[in-house]
Amino acid sequence: MGHGDEKLGAILIKSFLYTVSQTAPLPKTIVFFNGGVKLTCEGSEVLEDIKNMADNGVKIISCGTCLDFYGLKEKLQVGEISNMYTIYETLEKADRNIVLS
């Protein structure tokens, strides 16, 4: 999350996703792309928080090109595989977006 120390970034994203999972209202959709798709896959430290949000109606979308790039398509554990057209439409139609990089 953000630019800087990788360990700190992992701590911050874990804390952020836990916080989001415990608040109301939950977001309608969360989109994961680039290295963020690793968070939706087997072995992710935040997988339970993301699954909890999905179980409570949050749509989870992971970029298929990104999953292919990292060799993770078969390890996806939550949500659906999507493409940039759907990702663009989702972001474009949203009333507001929160972007983490």
Where are these regions (language model features)?
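Conserved mixed alpha/beta catalytic, RNA-binding, or beta-rich assembly cores of soluble enzyme
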Residues: 1-43
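Ligand-binding beta-strand-loop-alpha-helix segment within the catalytic cores
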Residues: 61, 78, 91
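Low-complexity intrinsically disordered segments
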Residues: 83-93
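Short amphipathic alpha-helical segments and helix-helix/interface helices
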Residues: 17, 47-51, 88
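A glycine-rich helix N-cap at a beta->alpha junction
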Residues: 46-72
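Short, well-ordered beta-strand core segments
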Residues: 30, 59-60, 97-98
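C-terminal binding/interaction regions
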Residues: 92-100
